[in-house]
Amino acid sequence: MKNKNGIYIIGVDHGYGNIKTANCCFTTGVESSDTEPTFKNDLLIYQGRYYQIGVGHKEYVAEKVMDEDYYILTLAAIARELSREQIAQANVFLAAGLPLSWVAKQRKAFQEYLLQNSAVEFTFRRIEYRIRIVGAAVYPQGFAAIAPIVNHFTGSNMLCDIGNGTMNILRTSDSKVDLRQMFTEKYGVQQCVLAIQEALMREHHAELEEQMIHNFLRYGTVGIDEGLEKAMKLAACDYTKKVFRKLREHGYDPRIMKLYVVGGGGCLLKNFFPIDPGRIVINNDICATAKGYEYMAEVQNLAGGVK
């Protein structure tokens, strides 16, 4: 979060697996109810309804404006950032993004979605917030993570942003983005999770909670039966090989270009693929894209002129 002339720029990375801001990350899940729930740890109250944030897992949707979920999750993200500074009333400028291949077509609708209410009052974690959303910008997902450093890129480079639902790919040449070489593949981490679940059921008649699988992908082990972990590792290794196959389909050549990997899926390559650290750079900061959105909004001075 950045304070620009009394306006707080808050970057929100609306992932399919997690919502990220510059300083926090929580599961992309929300359950709504007309009645107050028993457990209230991450409870958001808005317009008379109760929303449990981080509960369940939102299904993949091609357009994030199809329901109210991402709007409610945005309010929670705003509150999480403001609470760090003990702020409950603020003018907020939202900096968000969409997958590379979709941003041109969906930018306007998503911007209007985020701006649907200029004044918003809600309660989160028992704190009442009064927010004025003074503007919003929507940027290319993935590129935002390298925006602060792209001017230092030389030669030919490829960016691979592996999220939960999608994988975004773009090429740069001498720090300039090649607009003809931007791609979005529906081949995010969730595809690896599904492959692992299938392998465990097929080979061991075993079911494992998704969170345990995500922990395995992140840390390389979860301390369960050796045979189960072996099957999980084989499925994860197969997924990473397919990631590089898709990169090659879009022109990746390790002899010519460096590869920059961002997003939560970077840990899969780190744990399950033989990485050449001289040619492949993995950014482990899951909040890098949200930070990039804030950087881009600040550089473009979008919030500075808003009254």
Where do the PLM segments sit?
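Nucleotide/phosphate-binding catalytic cleft detector across ATP-hydrolyzing
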Residues: 1-159, 176-191, 203, 210-307
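Conserved blade-register residue in beta-propeller folds
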Residues: 21, 169-171
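Ser/Thr-glycine-rich phosphate-binding loops at phosphate-binding pockets of nucleotides
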Residues: 162-168
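Acidic, metal/cofactor-coordinating or nucleic-acid-engaging core segments within structured domains
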Residues: 197-203
